[in-house]
Amino acid sequence: MVDIIIPVYNALDTLELAVTSALMQGDVRILLVDDGSTDGTARLCDELAHHPRIAVIHQRNHGVSAARNAGLQAAASEWLTFLDADDVLLPDAIGNLLTLAGDSQAIQGLVTRSEAPDVPECTVQTLPSRDMLDLALRNPTVHLHTHGWLLRREICNERFNESLRLGEDGEWMMRVLRGTKTVARAQVNAYCYHLRADSAVHSAADVVREYLRTLTAAQPTLNYLDMPDAAAQYRLMHLLLMLTHGVVQEGGFRDGLRQCGAIRRLCRE
């Protein structure tokens, strides 16, 4: 059996579709973690939990990392995966990944923005964890997130850093992959990611500040891995993400310069 952890916050319009896609995966248990929703989502979670394969956890609003941690605490199956409440798992995703995983402790499927993507030639590549980490650090937006990953519960002893607001899933995945022996990558459509309408609610200054906090939190893991070239690319990718949102806002030039200085110091370390 596979536990599917769905952190939920004010997802009244999308949750049922996400849950339906999860139930279609076969032998799964769905853990809905309601993070203090205020729009009727909590009541919907209770209604959905009448299904024998759905359980619900209600908690006060502490953010997506706290919700994922509550799901990890409740997980009991050999394997687990995460699904955001406004995304969907593609048909047969879990079954295909389980079949291809073999003895690997984690396997990553393909993430798409289409619910009817082209079907790739089904292949799987098994890598030592260090090789996977090198690849992930060089391409964090492709690999360092929870989307499309199927993980053995035994490697998920780490918890999400609840103080982080952006890039927190990538920082967690780094720590999880650090504890693996082999990881598989599968050319299998697994996860459909929907662009968030609220993904730009942060001001540019907040985005820079939060990504900088994530880089600082990731520093001990990067030091432990001792992969300087890959780590430099990881930091540079975060710098590009910050620049995409704009480092300097009107009236915030000095603050932007200070934060750029902090980024440069991190890169030198």
Predicted feature residues:
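Acidic helix N-cap motif at the loop->helix transition within catalytic regions
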Residues: D13-L17, D39-E47, V88, D92-I94
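Conserved nucleotide-sugar donor-binding catalytic segment
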Residues: M132-D206
